[in-house]
Amino acid sequence: MSGLRLEGKIVIITGGASGIGADAARLFTDHGAKVVIVDVQEELGQNVAVLIGKDKASFYRCDVTNETEVEDAVKFTVEKHGKLDVLFSNAGVLEPLESFLDFDLERFDRIMAVNVRGAAAFIKHAARAMVEKGTRGSIVCTTSVSAEIGGGHHGYTASKHGLVGLIRSACGDLGKYGIRVNGVAPYAVATPMTSHDEVTGKQLEDYFDAKGILKGMVLKASHVAQVALFLASDDSAYISGQNLAVDGGYTVVKPSRD
């Protein structure tokens, strides 16, 4: 495949200030899109937009747990660019590993608010904007291999299972408008979300590589962004309701408690 895969497209990327979202913002604009980076990390988000170029990217501060802010972010995008073609709902949070006997339910509420409710709010308002303009749009959500297995991150795992259900439900309803809804499910990636002060990105990558199936390479945020680009573009024109794994075969080989 060659050429600009998102030429003339207008894209919102949530969680676009760092990690997978920032890589996607750079990649999508390289393929001809104009991108609105949405995040609560204002300084980081502004920096990503500036480095990409003000003619290609802009930043909008938004807390995805606040539906009014979500609606305003979509309105900002449509008023600035005249339409919305693609939503990459990528914002997410992760809690520390803990025993279920010590499950922090207040933290669980926060995780569900960001990872599920926040995605639902953006899908809702992005779809409304697409329908209003008659746009056959694409909505892509970052899920996880955790949506296929169990694990110690109980709140995160539950949220990603819920997000896949949301994707499937939205797919069934929005298809009549020509809107596609899909998920991209990465294996573990060293990003600011998964890294901690005492653990370097390289240490995380070494750990993930040891647990992974596909050897000889390490999954990077840029690899996930490439799959998001595929799902956002017309290359996947008849794909909807899918949760596409980017896991090197992990979920088909590894037991859930490995």
Swiss-Prot record:
User: What is a single Pfam family found in this protein's UniProt entry?
Assistant: adh_short_C2
Name the catalytic site residues: Y156 (proton acceptor)
UniProt keyword Oxidoreductase present: yes
What Enzyme Commission number(s) does the record list for this chain?
1.1.1.-
The record, for InterPro entries, names: NAD(P)-bd_dom_sf, SDR_fam
What residues bind NAD(+), as annotated?
A: 12-36
Q: Which UniProt keywords apply?
A: Oxidoreductase
Gene3D superfamilies named in the record:
NAD(P)-binding Rossmann-like Domain (3.40.50.720)
Residues recorded as binding substrate, renumbered to this chain, are S144
SUPFAM superfamilies to which the protein is assigned, alphabetical: NAD(P)-binding Rossmann-fold domains (SSF51735)
Keyword Kinase in annotation: no
The record's GO molecular-function terms, alphabetically, read:
oxidoreductase activity
Broad enzyme group: oxidoreductase
Write out the similarity annotation.
Answer: Belongs to the short-chain dehydrogenases/reductases (SDR) family.
What is the protein name for this chain? Answer: Short-chain dehydrogenase reductase 3c
Please report the organism this UniProt entry assigns to the protein: Arabidopsis thaliana
